[in-house]
């Protein structure tokens, strides 16, 4: 009897220790190693007086950490292919005829292909913003440069070690669009930290076009598998969903968008 009780105590102790084990998630990429990602996006946009439109997009991109100093990494992202079609499904006017728009034929899309986009990340996977010289060299519109460089994007990883089932929060703000995102470590495998996230996105974006303000109310959620050794996303296992409503006072009300992402 005493042996049985002792065995149970040991088992409970082991389970408690496992439940309390904490993990330090960090971005520690191998320098000059190129990772290839294929992202598929399915989007539905419902525009008042026009009707819903659907868009399927495939993005091929390479990512590479090229330099490191004081826990900061210079990461190059190169879009090698962007292909997709936007198709109106119902509505009135020209869109009702069902003409499809091929994204790869659009000049702004062509301008992105095979031109490295440089970002700085710290070891929490927090983007510090693009390097201004690089955005200028790419010919990015000045208003877009300002938006990219003023963006406050969330860190993917917490500052402290966390246990499975533990939450942490991060904030994001881009040109008036603010959100607080709750992350949760839901599983640890031999290869990956599995993290889910969910958050609201609300605000008024004022610099899309001169004199135009866009009110946005939405939600973002998803699941990401991060490599335990490098902190990179593990290709082929990640998903996200974004839903939002948008309105331009005096111009358009009730526009809705839903986006599903697989990477």
Pin down the residues of each PLM region:
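Short, positively charged
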Residues: 101, 133-142, 203-208
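Acidic, serine/threonine-rich low-complexity disordered tracts
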Residues: 20-97, 166, 170-263
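A glycine-biased structural micro-motif
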Residues: 103-118
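Extracytoplasmic beta-rich ectodomain segments of secreted or membrane-anchored proteins
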Residues: 128, 134-186
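Positively charged n-region of N-terminal signal peptides that target proteins for export
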Residues: 1-4
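Hydrophobic alpha-helical segments, especially N-terminal targeting/anchoring helices
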Residues: 121, 161, 226-227
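Hydrophobic h-region of N-terminal signal peptides that target proteins for export
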Residues: 10-18
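Short beta-rich binding modules
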Residues: 69, 120-122, 130-134
């Amino acid at each position: 009897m005493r042996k049985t009780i002792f065995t149970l105590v040991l088992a409970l102790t082991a389970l408690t220790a496992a439940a309390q084990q904490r993990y330090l998630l960090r971005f520690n990429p191998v320098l000059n190693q190129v990772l290839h990602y294929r992202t598929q996006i399915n989007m539905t946009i419902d525009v008042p007086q026009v009707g819903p439109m659907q868009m399927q997009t495939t993005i091929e991109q390479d990512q590479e950490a090229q330099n490191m100093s004081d826990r900061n990494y210079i990461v190059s992202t190169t879009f090698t292919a962007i292909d997709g079609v936007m198709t109106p499904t119902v509505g009135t006017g020209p869109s009702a005829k069902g003409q499809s728009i091929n994204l790869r034929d659009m000049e702004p899309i062509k301008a992105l292909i095979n031109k490295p986009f440089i970002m700085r990340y710290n070891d929490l996977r927090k983007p510090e913003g693009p390097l201004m010289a690089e955005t200028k060299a790419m010919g990015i519109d000045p208003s877009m440069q300002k938006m990219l460089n003023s963006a406050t994007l969330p860190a993917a990883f917490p500052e402290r070690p966390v246990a499975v089932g533990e939450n942490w929060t991060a904030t994001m703000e881009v040109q008036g669009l603010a959100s607080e995102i709750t992350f949760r470590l839901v599983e640890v495998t031999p290869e990956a930290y599995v993290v889910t996230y969910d958050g609201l996105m609300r605000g008024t974006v004022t610099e899309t076009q001169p004199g135009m303000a866009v009110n946005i109310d939405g939600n973002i959620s998803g699941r990401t598998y991060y490599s335990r050794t490098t902190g990179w996303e593990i290709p082929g296992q990640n998903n996200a969903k974004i839903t939002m409503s948008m309105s331009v006072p005096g111009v358009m009300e009730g526009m809705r968008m839903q986006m599903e992402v697989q990477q």
